[in-house]
Regions:
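Bacterial N-terminal signal peptides that target proteins for export
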Residues: 4-19
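C-terminal motif of bacterial Sec signal peptides marking the signal peptidase cleavage site
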Residues: 25-28
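Short, low-complexity, disordered segments immediately C-terminal to signal peptides
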Residues: 30-46
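Glycine-centered tight beta-turn/hairpin loop motif at sheet-sheet or coil-to-beta transitions
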Residues: 83-85, 116-118, 160-162
């Protein structure tokens, strides 16, 4: 039996070009997909200022505000609070190689609780740009500063006669501490 038509011999290069053009034609038929929309940045809800008196400090609401790093030479600091009002300050005096931990309000003692250790310090009166604060001065290589810098989640500041405050453990305090160690 013979076939009614003869097969035509086509060179291999022409077959490859035909296959490529076929794929190109199919690709042109595919719909274009729009790029996904960029995620919209949503600000976290403001923290509610609630005086705390008991319970586990890890469950306390965070104090309202956020950390701000203020570079300077020889003084740099990390300030926590709303606007220009600071509730807690970590100040580095690089010339003296000292770190001052300050809390708004006047009290005789500061207890700072990190995720794995707490420390109690006698506090003195410190002036922060005209605002009365209680503070403690530590050597820049004091080990408790590392405990604060590497605390997981939050830090609590307790003082007799003042409500306790819970602060998020962000990078800004560690930056101020490291400025004193350079």
């Amino acid at each position: 039996m013979t076939f009614p038509f003869r097969f035509i011999h086509v060179p291999i290069g022409a077959r490859r070009i035909a296959a490529f053009l076929s794929l190109l034609a199919l690709a042109a038929c595919a719909p274009t997909v729009a790029p996904p929309a960029a995620p919209v940045a949503v600000a976290p809800p403001p923290a509610v200022s609630v005086p705390v008196s008991g319970g586990d400090w890890r469950d306390w609401p965070l104090a309202p505000g956020s950390w701000r790093y203020v570079p300077g030479n020889p003084i740099s600091e990390a300030r926590y609070g709303e606007g220009q009002t600071a509730q807690f300050v970590v100040r580095c005096d690089a010339a003296k190689r000292q770190v001052t931990l300050m809390r708004a309000g006047v009290t005789a003692e500061l207890t700072i609780q990190a995720s794995n250790r707490a420390a109690r310090f006698p506090a003195g009166h410190v002036d922060d740009h005209g605002v009365a604060m209680s503070g403690v001065v530590l050597n820049a290589v004091d080990g408790f500063l590392d405990v604060m810098a590497f605390s997981r989640g939050r830090i609590a500041v307790l003082s007799p006669g003042l409500p306790g405050i819970a602060l998020p453990a962000w990078a800004e305090p560690a930056r101020a501490i490291e400025d004193c160690r350079k």
